[in-house]
UniProtKB/Swiss-Prot annotation:
SUPFAM superfamilies: Galactose mutarotase-like (SSF74650). Its EC number is 5.1.3.3. Gene3D superfamilies: 2.70.98.10. InterPro entries: Aldose_1/G6P_1-epimerase (IPR008183), Gal_mutarotase_sf_dom (IPR011013), GH-type_carb-bd (IPR014718). It catalyses: alpha-D-glucose = beta-D-glucose. Belongs to the aldose epimerase family. This is Aldose 1-epimerase. It comes from Lactobacillus helveticus. One of its GO terms (molecular function) is carbohydrate binding. The gene is galM. Keywords: Carbohydrate metabolism, Isomerase. One of its GO terms (biological process) is glucose metabolic process. The keyword Transmembrane helix does not apply. It comes from the Bacteria.
Length: 129
């Protein structure tokens, strides 16, 4: 198992990185910290998912390929939810509703921490408010 990362640019003073996870059987997964985007899943050098040509292309295209759904998967009616007696208002981004975590998580630069062990390779991505 192996992890590495390559810097390919900057946004808002932060490095844009392609994180590479590899196993011992020829599988390679590439994730971008730009939008926590699943960029490629390679098996024997064949990409198993639809991808753009380069990491930099993801900041130019708004097609959501490999995109991570925000903190909420699905639609929240009128962007409101209740926790106990308190009502919370979320940003509206789908008519009068909130959908898939709100506006812009796909264009944020996420913090990342790759790690590996004898049996696994992983990356943790975090987006702080």
């Amino acid at each position: 198992m192996k992890t590495s990362f390559n810097k390919y640019g900057r946004k808002d003073g932060k490095d844009l990185c392609e994180i590479v996870l590899e196993n011992d059987h020829g599988m390679i997964v590439k994730v971008l910290n730009y939008g926590a985007t699943l960029e490629k899943v390679l098996l024997n050098d064949e990409n198993m998912i639809l991808s753009l040509n380069s990491p930099a292309d993801y900041s130019q295209e708004r097609n959501y390929l490999g995109g991570t759904v925000g903190r909420i998967a699905g639609r929240v009616r009128k962007g409101q939810w209740r926790h106990g007696l308190e009502t919370h208002q979320l940003p509206i981004n789908d008519g009068e509703n909130h959908i898939h975590g709100g506006i812009g998580t796909d264009t944020e630069v996420w913090d990342f921490k790759p790690s590996c062990s004898e049996n696994s390779a992983r990356v943790d991505l975090t987006l702080l408010d």
